[in-house]
Amino acid sequence: MSQTLPKIKIPKKPNYNSLALAEGIEFWELFRVIEAKYENCFLLESAGDNQYDSRYSVIGFQPSHLILGEPGILEIDGKKYPVENPYFALRELTDYNSLSISYAGGFVGYLGYQSMQFFEPKLQLKPHPDFPAMIFGLYLDGLIYDKFTGELIYFDNGTNRIHEVNQILEQLKKENSQKPKATVSLVKAGLSKEVHKQMVEEALEEVKAGNTFQCQIGFEEIYQVDGNPLAIYETLREINPSPHMYYVNLELVTILGASPSSLFRLRQGEMESFPLAGTTKRGVDAKEDTLLARKLLTDPKEIAEHNMLIDLHRNDVGRVAKFGTVKVRRRFDVKRFSHVQHISSEVVGILSSKEDMFSGLASSFPRGTLSGAPKIESDSKIIERIEKSPRGPYGGAVGSFGLNGDCTFAIPIRSFFVNGKKGFVRASGGIVFGFIEPEDEYQEIINKMASVRKALDLHKGP
């Protein structure tokens, strides 16, 4: 390394101040105003069934630093530093020793699917033409909303901008937030059943040859976006409330989504990961939902795929856990979302004292749900060759590295990825030998795209 990375000094103890939303004003309206005012901002929220996870929503605006990563390069506020590994270089930028057990700011952004080469140096993956491999904003202040109590909290780490927030709150008292507008048009449709079938058959040949046990193959649809992508997110959050909902806008890059899948969470030393694989559609009523769920739980292909993922998650968590602490807390639950039902399990473990949130996330990246097994073989020699187009942020990680050493990341699926006026949606399905009907796999991809497609359809121009 020819240049020394800057060290960002952050106080150990953050400040928290209670604010008040005027009666009748929602936290969402506050974000509308912030998004219109600040070029770089984020909203992280949840509509999950876990009370702890869904209780808090977080807003950040105008980060103190903007960090981009590509192989061999870490870019900080436009200045490029040659580094051995841009991902692990994040660890060097500050100390992550905040004394708060609550959220106190940190790095918010995404790792693209191609970031796998940061953890597996032998991989040579094609870069996405429109999205950097990694981009994060460092947010040292922001807003936390407690949905249970209605309390609005402003936190900061020495750079207090509470006066700016109060100005926005006063503005909301006087006038309603302006609803964002956007129109979209389809530029490139997804693949036909025939082309997808050829891809599935090609993947099956790799499975038969023993090159992989399971492989995730899919495709994308490309759209032109005119207007504000926040309008699309507003629609998506209404039609597909999910455990992980996010709107992250950094420079020209915007990721918006409603993902059912947690990638990795570290909270006060406990790691959690959630295998989510096995998919069926929603029924027209509760009775059909139950019948479809029962069929899902007795489907040999879906059971085989999910069992493989449980093993992958146990192995991933076990790489950085204290010996003997890894266990499957829940197994084969069925989670229901707006358009699909999934089989879900939970794997937990206690982080080793030699590890941290960066090595913890790295051990789980990317999730086998989006790659297959073994990961290197599936990623480098099969998926990229068969799919042809690089995945970009899809299937990577979106979330936050906290200044207190905790982190939460979701898998960016059921998402829309925008750069300038170009956006895409993508989905994939698992290929397991002996259990594949190409037409079913094609329909699974269509089902997975359904919520984002519906949101986009509601914004199509004349």
UniProtKB/Swiss-Prot annotation:
Recorded GO MF terms: anthranilate synthase activity; metal ion binding
Binding site for chorismate: 278-279, 394, 414, 428-430
Metal-binding is among the record's keywords: yes
Keyword Oxidoreductase: no
Enzyme class: lyase
Cofactor binding comment, as recorded: Binds 1 Mg(2+) ion per subunit.
EC number: 4.1.3.27
InterPro entries documented for this protein: ADC_synthase, Anth_synth_I-like, Anth_synth_I_N, Chorismate_C
GO biological process entries: L-tryptophan biosynthetic process
Protein name per the record: Anthranilate synthase component 1
Gene name of this polypeptide: trpE
